Amino acid sequence: MKLLYFAWLRQKIGKAEETLDPPASVATVAELIAWLKTRGPGYADALKNPKLVRVAVNREYVQGDFKLKPGDEVGLFPPVTGG
């Protein structure tokens, strides 16, 4: 699974992208975020409030209950605001 991090998520996690193989118990977006938070302090800080993180799977916005598949591309980024 390819993960892409944008804006302040990228800064806190310390990388723009990575390829990971989550455990079989990670089936949904919410479970992926919970698992990522266990990968270190940068992840835990960036993902501490999931309401501040938008997720796109294969370039489509999804909710936390969205079922993931091997090979998905998952983008995590802050909500877009207007000005």
Model-derived features with residue positions:
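Ubiquitin-like/PB1-type beta-grasp interaction modules and other compact soluble beta-rich domains
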Residues: 1-82
